[in-house]
């Protein structure tokens, strides 16, 4: 019985070694390289849209519209509006903290008091 088990074990090791040398490994095939779809998913639409090789196809816009050249050069792809909103929010918050620290907010009526009158 031990002799059969040893022979079986030895034959399995030999088969595994031979299959690796001939490239017949049972593992899954490796995925190589990036496709446009995977790069767009991982990097976002702005990274793919601004890639130079994709913008060279000026005749074919496909699903996405190409931004005008002035917007790309100036960097105005919808970010200034968001940046202005962020800056405004930060300034309002800092003003609130300054007024709270100065005690100016303690004298203001609460919203319930203004609704009652």
From Swiss-Prot:
Superkingdom, taxonomy of origin: Eukaryota
Keyword line: Amidation, Cleavage on pair of basic residues, Hormone, Neuropeptide, Secreted, Signal
Signal sequence range: 1-19
Keyword field contains Secreted: yes
Propeptide residue span(s): 20-30
GO CC terms in record: extracellular space; neuronal cell body; secretory granule
Threonine amide: modified positions: 61
Molecular function terms from GO: galanin receptor activity; neuropeptide hormone activity; type 1 galanin receptor binding; type 2 galanin receptor binding; type 3 galanin receptor binding
GO BP annotations, alphabetical order: nervous system development; parental behavior; positive regulation of cortisol secretion; positive regulation of timing of catagen; positive regulation of transcription by RNA polymerase II; protein kinase A signaling
Cellular localisation: Secreted
SMART domains the UniProt entry points to: Galanin
Function: Endocrine hormone of the central and peripheral nervous systems that binds and activates the G protein-coupled receptors GALR1, GALR2, and GALR3. This small neuropeptide may regulate diverse physiologic functions including contraction of smooth muscle of the gastrointestinal and genitourinary tract, growth hormone and insulin release and adrenal secretion.
Family that this chain belongs to: Belongs to the galanin family.
Name of the protein described by the UniProt record: Galanin peptides
Organism of provenance: Coturnix japonica
């Amino acid at each position: 019985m031990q002799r059969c088990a040893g022979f079986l074990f030895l034959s399995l090791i030999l088969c595994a070694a031979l299959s690796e040398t001939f490239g017949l490994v049972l593992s899954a095939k490796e995925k190589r390289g990036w496709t446009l779809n995977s790069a767009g998913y991982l990097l976002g639409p702005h990274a793919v849209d601004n890639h130079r090789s994709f913008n060279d196809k000026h005749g074919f816009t496909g699903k996405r519209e190409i931004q005008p050249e002035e917007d790309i050069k100036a960097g105005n792809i919808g970010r200034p509006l968001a940046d202005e909103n962020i800056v405004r929010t930060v300034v309002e918050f800092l003003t609130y903290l300054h007024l709270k620290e100065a005690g100016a907010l303690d004298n203001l009526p609460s919203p319930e008091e203004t609704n009652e009158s």
